[in-house]
């Protein structure tokens, strides 16, 4: 992963 979708998924998971 480039580091954009993962970041988004991580943020969504945290929320």
Curated annotation (Swiss-Prot):
GO (cellular component) term, any one: extracellular region
EC number: 3.4.21.-
Gene Ontology molecular function terms on file: serine-type peptidase activity; toxin activity
Domain Peptidase S1, first and last residues per copy: 1-15
Main location as per UniProt: secreted
Localization (cell): Secreted
Record protein name field: Protein C activator
Protein species of origin: Gloydius halys
Phylogenetic classification of the source organism: Eukaryota, Metazoa, Chordata, Craniata, Vertebrata
């Amino acid at each position: 992963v480039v580091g954009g979708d993962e970041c988004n998924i991580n943020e969504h998971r945290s929320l």
